[in-house]
């Protein structure tokens, strides 16, 4: 075992998945004193066929046993409902499409969890996210861990080395204090390497499927879940010519760019998947809360689905201050390729982005996240 971090305590968020399991193993190999924490962030439906919390904890405990570390079960459900889920519902009721995983990272995993870890005497926390952190001196030199502790360098959030798994988009609201206490070991690896390591180590969850979907919804049908908290308010579905062609169940249950579940047909004629025409599929293009109208269009390339700019609010910048106006790249949704853009400052915590190439289905409530090459600068919530 490498002893270079001997005596330093790090608390790892063990989710039951393979990424956090390998994270814990790597840190122990580096000489850290590792403690595992399993976070329970959702209280209801533990007996539901869709809830995996109990199974995940069993998997996390089995991992801790193999690695030889302590594990603690901590309940953050109250904090989650207050700081994340309440905002999630408010956004949907306002007709927007929020990303609760971004808020969960900022408020729970890197705030409530971090605070708990510090009370345990930890110097650092770690998670299985595919991202990286580095500390840069005022003169631009990249500092190692020892130098970073002794300097007032600036911490940067970088994309994970595996482009297919990069999760910096979800972490863009982290600040300097949070990043200074955070380690992302698997961000330096490809997912295939993580799986290989897990198998070589003999971790019991080495072949476990990656989790998908919003953390508190799991694999259950999203509309069924949302309907438990938001009442349905049916209204007209209209096309771009103003013709009523159907009825929606409530604007909160739809998002821009949505194609499935509209209930208005739309034949998938061969060769018409992305173009217009009478047989092209329908997409949600606009939501009018004032008239409770859902506007839809045919064809992936319809002008109503294309945007050359956006306005964002509630900006959060990793460096603590907004970058200077200029040219960057941005994502307006997860897994989107970086798109060249120009940043312009707005009033207060607002900003504007313009794109030389049109962006598809830019969605209010989602996040616009800025990048300077591999460095994630931060971002804000899309307003329009």
From Swiss-Prot:
Reaction(s) catalysed (UniProt annotation): S-sulfanyl-L-cysteinyl-[protein] + uridine(34) in tRNA + AH2 + ATP = 2-thiouridine(34) in tRNA + L-cysteinyl-[protein] + A + AMP + diphosphate + H(+)
Disulfide bonds: 104-215
One Gene Ontology cellular component annotation held by this UniProt entry: cytoplasm
GO molecular-function terms, A-Z: ATP binding; tRNA binding; tRNA-uridine 2-sulfurtransferase activity
CDD domains for the chain: MnmA_TRMU-like
Positions that bind ATP: 13-20, 39, 128
Domain of life of the native organism: Bacteria
Keywords associated with the record: ATP-binding, Cytoplasm, Disulfide bond, Nucleotide-binding, RNA-binding, Transferase, tRNA processing, tRNA-binding
Stated name of the protein: tRNA-specific 2-thiouridylase MnmA
Signal peptide: none
Region (Interaction with tRNA): 165-167, 333-334
EC number: 2.8.1.13
HAMAP family named among the record's database cross-references: tRNA_thiouridyl_MnmA
A biological process term (GO) from this entry: tRNA wobble position uridine thiolation
């Amino acid at each position: 075992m490498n002893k270079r971090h001997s005596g330093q305590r790090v608390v790892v968020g063990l989710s039951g998945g393979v990424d956090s399991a390998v994270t814990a193993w790597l840190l122990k190999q580096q000489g850290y004193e590792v403690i595992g924490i399993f976070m329970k962030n959702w209280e209801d439906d533990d007996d539901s066929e869709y809830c995996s919390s109990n199974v995940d904890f069993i998997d996390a405990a089995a991992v801790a046993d193999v690695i030889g570390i302590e594990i603690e079960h901590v309940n953050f459900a109250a904090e989650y409902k207050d700081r994340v889920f309440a905002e999630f519902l408010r956004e949907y009721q306002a007709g927007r499409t929020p990303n609760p995983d971004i808020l969960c990272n900022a408020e729970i995993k890197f705030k409530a969890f971090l605070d708990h870890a510090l009370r345990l005497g930890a110097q650092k926390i770690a998670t299985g996210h595919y991202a990286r952190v580095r500390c840069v001196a005022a003169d631009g030199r990249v500092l190692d861990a020892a130098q970073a502790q002794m300097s007032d360098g600036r911490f940067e959030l970088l994309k994970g080395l595996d482009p297919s798994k990069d999760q910096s988009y979800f972490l863009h609201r982290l600040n300097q204090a949070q990043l200074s206490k955070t380690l992302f070991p698997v961000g330096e690896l490809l997912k295939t390497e993580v799986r290989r390591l897990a198998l070589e180590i003999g971790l019991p969850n080495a072949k476990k499927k990656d989790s998908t979907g919003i953390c508190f919804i799991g694999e259950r049908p999203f509309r069924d879940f949302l309907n438990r908290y938001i009442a349905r308010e049916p209204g007209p579905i209209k096309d771009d010519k103003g013709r009523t062609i159907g009825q929606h169940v409530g604007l909160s249950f739809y998002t821009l760019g949505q194609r499935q579940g509209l209930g208005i047909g739309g034949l998938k004629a061969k060769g018409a998947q992305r173009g217009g025409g009478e047989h092209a599929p329908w997409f949600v293009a606009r939501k009018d809360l004032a008239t409770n109208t859902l506007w839809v269009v045919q064809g992936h390339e319809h002008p109503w689905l294309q945007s050359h700019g956006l306005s964002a609010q509630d900006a959060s910048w990793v460096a603590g201050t907004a970058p200077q106006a200029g040219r960057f790249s941005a994502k307006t949704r997860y897994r989107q390729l970086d798109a060249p853009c120009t940043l312009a400052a707005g009033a207060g915590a607002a900003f504007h982005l313009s794109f030389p190439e049109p962006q598809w289905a830019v969605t209010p409530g989602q996040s616009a996240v800025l990048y300077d090459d591999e460095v994630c600068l931060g971002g804000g919530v899309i307003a329009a």
